[in-house]
Amino acid sequence: SLSEQTLTHTESREEFFQRRENEQKTLTPKPAPLPLPPTASPVPQGENMIEFCDVTVTYGSRHILHHLDWTVRCGERWALTGPNGAGKSTLLSLICADNPQGYACPIHLFGKRRGRGESIWEIKKHIGFVSPEMFSTYRKPLPAIDIAASGLRDTIGLYVRPSQQERELCLEWMERFGAGDLATRDYLSLSDGEQRLVLLVRAFVKQPALLILDEPFHGLDDELTNRARSIIDAYMARPDRTLIMV
């Protein structure tokens, strides 16, 4: 009878649902990772992607960069560290062709001297970029997949409708990062962490030769951070890809 049974375990409602969730994660196999596509605009391995020769940048009387010599070769991985105001953002703006002082500096990007007639888009097509500043810049009421697709043409917002093939490519990248279910949702309705994840996806969609990731894991939980690290490591396994991490 019921009166003869012994109660062996008790748990709160929250503990019960957490246990069921953990059991479900254990029983549900993780999908196989999608294969990574080749680099879209490769640069020959070993060639200089970035070359700064005695570069100085000033704002008023303040020297932000002072006689800087720096060479980044294809296939290398760099980590830029330093306190706020050390010049990291200025350095990245020179690489991404966003700083007008770059025209007057002895800088070579992807084998070409800056200021010799190349457009900024010819430079940006090689670069996938994400930074904390982009989080405050991208305030467009668009589906998340369109925000990711804006990385194909380096725009803030989507001004050229992507082809079906491009949309499928962007969706594949969102699925790699565990963001596939966000694709059709309004970007502005997403949480801060989800928005940052979409912007990280945006950096990868054109399979760039150079990744510049400025605090890429900021706002991501542990699971998404670990997934992103794995994707970055897998992406960088190809010798024609270069990474600058800040």
Give a label for each model feature.
Residues 222-224:
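Helix N-cap at the start of a conserved alpha-helix in ABC-type nucleotide-binding domains
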Residues 81-83:
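The feature captures the beta-strand-to-loop junction immediately N-terminal to the Walker
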Residues 131-189, 195:
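ABC-family P-loop ATPase nucleotide-binding domains
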Residues 211-215:
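Catalytic Walker B motif of ABC-type/P-loop ATPase nucleotide-binding domains
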Residues 106-122, 188:
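ABC ATPase NBD Q-loop/coupling interface
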Residues 200:
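Hydrophobic anchor residue at the start of the ABC signature
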Residues 50, 64-67:
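Conserved structural motif at the start of ABC-family nucleotide-binding domains
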